[in-house]
């Protein structure tokens, strides 16, 4: 399958949040970029100020609210929007998308579509049939088949400050991986390739849960030993649920797995880590979410994974404990005691 566009064509970015803006600025070092903002007013405001999410825009970036313009101008597009919004966005863009497009998303969350307008209930078992990764959403809602995922330890603030980092572009198609590497790789940003698309996507989604747990440990002042315990057992929990959902264990021990987990569980700039810290201080989850400018994907992921674990009979004690804290069924102190008393057996039994 040949590409319609030449290397001189601009690249699209869907989403003008902190990470979307970082990606747009990075791409603009090599090519023209069209950055999509969710409303005409926001697009105009960003264009006028030449700033988005506290970051100055590169001169090669144009901001728009026109999805048709993005699709018709760009062969390669990076969707970077919250998971709860991606399906609706791709559905609106679908009339303009064609099989020649390449979409590489940077969203670390699940899509849940339940029959008969049912609401997600974490205490009700939920099968994989109703839970989709972002690449699956893109392929369901459009004619695009060349889909990829950008994942790894990519804290937006550090990348905006031009500090060194690395990421993974995962796809079943080599040309998608090559496109991601050619467009994004530079002297401070390494890009690795991985053919395990589902595994890499699951890494990015599931680590957000553990990051909230690490934030709780930090908020309680329990020290580095406790955080190391939480992170290492969290990795095991990620692998258990990841295997149940079709992921390969190898992805979890790479940059998109353990790499992203370490970064997100160690940085007070991580939104999910911040949620955990504030929960430990006694704030209610509704107050925390309302006060945050951008989405902390881990909160919703906890409820989804709790339901999935019920269906697949996978014990996820960290997820269960965080679910109980969020829903005020257990205090933070009681949840910590619960985890310390949990009957873990062999340390490693997934290899």
Regions found by a protein language model. Give the residues of each.
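NAD(P)-dependent Rossmann-like dehydrogenase/reductase catalytic/cofactor-binding core
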Residues: 2, 214-218, 243-253, 257-351
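NAD(P)+-binding Rossmann beta1-loop-alpha1 motif at the extreme N-terminus of oxidoreductases
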Residues: 2-65, 69, 92, 135
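Structural beta-sheet core signal
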Residues: 13, 35, 103-105, 149, ...
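Electropositive phosphate-/nucleotide-binding environments in soluble metabolic enzymes
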Residues: 17, 21, 40, 64, ...
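Rossmann-like NAD(P)(H) cofactor-binding subdomain of soluble oxidoreductases
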Residues: 57-60, 64-161, 180
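Internal alpha-helical scaffold of NAD(P)-dependent oxidoreductase catalytic cores
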Residues: 85, 96, 137-147, 164-212, ...
């Amino acid at each position: 399958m040949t590409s319609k566009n030449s290397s001189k064509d601009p690249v699209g970015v869907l989403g003008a949040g902190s990470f979307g803006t970082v990606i747009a600025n990075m791409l603009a070092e090599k090519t023209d970029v069209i950055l999509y903002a969710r409303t005409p007013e926001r697009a105009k405001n960003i264009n006028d100020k030449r700033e988005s999410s506290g970051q100055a825009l590169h001169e090669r970036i144009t901001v728009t609210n026109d999805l048709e313009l993005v699709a018709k101008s760009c062969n390669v597009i990076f969707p970077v929007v919250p998971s709860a919004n991606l399906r609706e966005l791709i559905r609106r863009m679908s009339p303009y998308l064609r099989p020649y497009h390449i979409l590489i998303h940077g969203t670390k969350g699940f899509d849940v579509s339940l029959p008969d307008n049912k609401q997600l209930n974490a205490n009700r078992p939920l099968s994989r049939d109703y839970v989709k990764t972002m690449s699956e959403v893109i392929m369901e809602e459009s004619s695009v088949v060349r889909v990829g995922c950008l994942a790894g330890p990519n804290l937006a603030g550090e990348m905006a400050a031009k500090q060194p980092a690395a990421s993974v572009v995962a796809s079943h198609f080599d040309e998608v991986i090559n496109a991601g590497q050619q467009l994004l790789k530079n002297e401070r940003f390494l890009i690795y390739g991985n053919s395990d698309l589902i595994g890499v996507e699951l890494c990015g989604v599931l680590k957000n849960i553990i990051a909230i747990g690490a934030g709780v440990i930090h908020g309680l002042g329990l020290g580095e030993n406790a955080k190391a315990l939480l992170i290492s057992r969290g990795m095991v929990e990620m692998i258990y649920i990841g295997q149940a959902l079709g992921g390969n264990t190898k992805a979890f021990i790479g940059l998109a797995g353990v790499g992203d987990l370490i970064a997100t569980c160690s940085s007070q700039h991580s939104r999910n880590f911040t949620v955990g810290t504030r929960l430990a201080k006694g704030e209610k989850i509704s107050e925390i979410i309302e006060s945050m400018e951008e989405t902390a994907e881990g909160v919703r992921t906890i409820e989804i994974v709790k339901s999935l674990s019920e269906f697949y009979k996978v014990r996820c004690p960290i997820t269960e404990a965080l679910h109980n804290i969020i829903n005020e069924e257990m205090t933070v102190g009681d949840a910590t005691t619960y985890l310390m008393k949990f009957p873990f057996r062999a340390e490693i039994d997934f290899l």
